[in-house]
């Protein structure tokens, strides 16, 4: 029996994919959000899903629908307030996700870093082997009626994942990435412990993470990594090239064969290893796993590349020092003979205050560094720190860029420009690309 769902905040990076899933499953889906364009709305529009501006009248008009409430919306939001007044059926985003988890063999991917890339890779492999629905944090969702598997990105922010009860879970790492919510790393670890205790079958955790080693869930834990003395699934004989990464996999002394991924950086090998581990334990054909790993093309805003004349532009969501390390490492592997120029927009004042020194250290891996001003959030409009303070600690700092003045970036030729950030770094990237395209055309 099909239903009608109304999403309050339908353009959210989780809400959009969930809306797509429910639509694909034959339900009537619509929702509301802000007017300004976001990259998550394109697939919604392509599916014919109606997007309305926020209005209390929407609730009156669709009062018979099931309302899905986005995590960002409090009781005083105009539509939430009206829904509460009318007493319509309203469920939270996590509750709606859990409904999908409960219907299939479910695999959740959680971690401070790497969860979107890992979820995307896992979904790609599994969907090509068996009927699979998936929800990825880059705004991508797909619903398949009578799915055998459901692959989902599980977000730890504000403990959104705490009530998920998947069959399997991949835990990529634990880190203090949300200082605006969590008290400290111990608080984050407690949240992951709560989540892990809901996993029904097996957990696959990165073996080098000391906080993941502290977890004592009811489910069996298989550690993956590069240490044959402590890990269950081990990547050995690692070879990195400008075409990708290659490695052998051993499970508790048993060789599973050689694998390759068209991805770059040590983190990509670990992500792929976790996917191999889950698929192997679900008794999927190893030859199929190998084949589909090689055809993966990535997810949005994770090392996304484009070429403009002699310049390679990379767009990445990296907004934490660990993620910057991984992105610049990947750029070095793929482009070992080119200048790597980092353009970074810090995200939230609380994160910059917590990691100012670490940001500077991570960015030193680039040949030159440029910063945009800090992107705040709905909860943090301003703070007692600036991007210039990060720049002052970077020996290769080139200056602060402005959207209407890209002159600092224009002298580079045959270089790799790496734009990183979780705010609106894309507007700087687009401004640079537009000017670069004009200048290169004029020179021809």
Curated annotation (Swiss-Prot):
Reaction it catalyzes: UDP-N-acetyl-alpha-D-muramate + L-alanine + ATP = UDP-N-acetyl-alpha-D-muramoyl-L-alanine + ADP + phosphate + H(+)
Biological process (GO), any one: regulation of cell shape
GO CC annotation, single: cytoplasm
Residues binding ATP: 111-117
Domain of life: Bacteria
Enzyme Commission (EC) number: 6.3.2.8
Keywords: ATP-binding, Cell cycle, Cell division, Cell shape, Cell wall biogenesis/degradation, Cytoplasm, Ligase, Nucleotide-binding, Peptidoglycan synthesis
InterPro entries to which the protein is assigned, alphabetical: Mur-like_cat_sf (IPR036565), Mur_ligase_C (IPR004101), Mur_ligase_C_dom_sf (IPR036615), Mur_ligase_cen (IPR013221), Mur_ligase_N (IPR000713), MurCDEF_pg_biosynth (IPR050061), UDP-N-AcMur_Ala_ligase_MurC (IPR005758)
Pathway(s) the chain acts in: Cell wall biogenesis; peptidoglycan biosynthesis
Enzyme class label: ligase
One Pfam family hit: Mur_ligase_C
Entry keyword Transmembrane helix: no
Gene Ontology molecular-function annotations: ATP binding; UDP-N-acetylmuramate-L-alanine ligase activity
UniProt-listed Gene3D superfamilies: Mur ligase, C-terminal domain (3.90.190.20), Mur-like, catalytic domain (3.40.1190.10), NAD(P)-binding Rossmann-like Domain (3.40.50.720)
Subcellular location: Cytoplasm
Entry-linked HAMAP family: MurC
Described purpose of this protein according to its UniProt entry: Cell wall formation.
UniProt similarity note: Belongs to the MurCDEF family.
Protein name, entry field: UDP-N-acetylmuramate--L-alanine ligase
């Amino acid at each position: 029996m099909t239903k009608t769902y109304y999403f309050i905040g339908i353009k959210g990076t989780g809400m959009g994919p969930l809306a797509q899933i429910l639509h694909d499953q034959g339900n009537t889906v619509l929702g509301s959000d802000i007017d300004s364009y976001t990259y998550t709305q394109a697939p919604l529009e392509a599916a014919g899903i109606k997007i309305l501006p926020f209005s209390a009248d929407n609730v009156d008009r669709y009062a018979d629908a099931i309302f899905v409430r986005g995590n960002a919306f409090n009781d005083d939001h105009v539509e939430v307030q009206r829904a509460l007044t009318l007493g319509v059926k309203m469920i939270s985003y996590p509750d709606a996700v859990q409904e999908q988890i409960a219907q299939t063999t479910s695999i959740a991917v959680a971690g401070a870093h790497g969860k979107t890339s890992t979820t995307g890779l896992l979904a790609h492999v599994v969907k090509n082997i068996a009927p699979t629905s998936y929800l990825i944090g880059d705004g991508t969702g797909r619903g398949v009626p009578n799915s055998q598997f459901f692959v989902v990105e599980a977000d730890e922010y504000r403990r959104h994942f705490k009530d998920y009860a998947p069959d399997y879970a991949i835990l990529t790492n634990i880190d203090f990435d949300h200082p605006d919510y969590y008290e400290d790393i111990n608080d984050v670890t407690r949240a992951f412990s709560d989540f892990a205790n809901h996993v029904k079958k097996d957990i696959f955790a990165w073996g080098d993470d000391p906080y993941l080693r502290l977890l004592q869930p009811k489910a069996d834990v298989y550690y993956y990594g590069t240490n044959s003395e402590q890990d269950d699934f081990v990547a050995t004989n690692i070879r990195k090239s400008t075409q990708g990464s290659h490695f052998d996999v051993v499970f508790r002394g048993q060789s599973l064969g050689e694998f390759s991924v068209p991805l770059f950086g040590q983190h990509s090998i670990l992500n792929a290893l976790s996917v191999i581990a889950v698929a192997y334990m679900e008794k999927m054909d190893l030859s199929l796993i190998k084949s589909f790993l090689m055809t993966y093309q990535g997810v949005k805003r994770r090392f996304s590349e484009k070429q403009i004349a002699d310049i390679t532009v990379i767009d990445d969501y990296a907004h934490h020092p660990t993620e910057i390390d991984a992105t610049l490492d990947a750029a070095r592997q793929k482009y070992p003979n080119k200048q790597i120029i980092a353009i970074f927009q810090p995200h939230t004042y609380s994160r910059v205050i917590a990691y100012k020194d670490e940001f500077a250290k991570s960015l030193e891996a680039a040949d030159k560094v440029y910063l945009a001003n800090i992107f705040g959030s709905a909860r943090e409009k301003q703070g007692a720190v600036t991007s210039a303070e990060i720049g002052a600690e970077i020996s290769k700092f080139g200056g602060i860029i402005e959207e209407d003045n890209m002159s600092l970036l224009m002298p580079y030729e045959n270089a790799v420009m790496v734009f990183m950030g979780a705010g609106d770094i894309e507007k700087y990237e687009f401004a640079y690309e537009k000017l670069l395209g004009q200048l290169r055309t004029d020179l021809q």
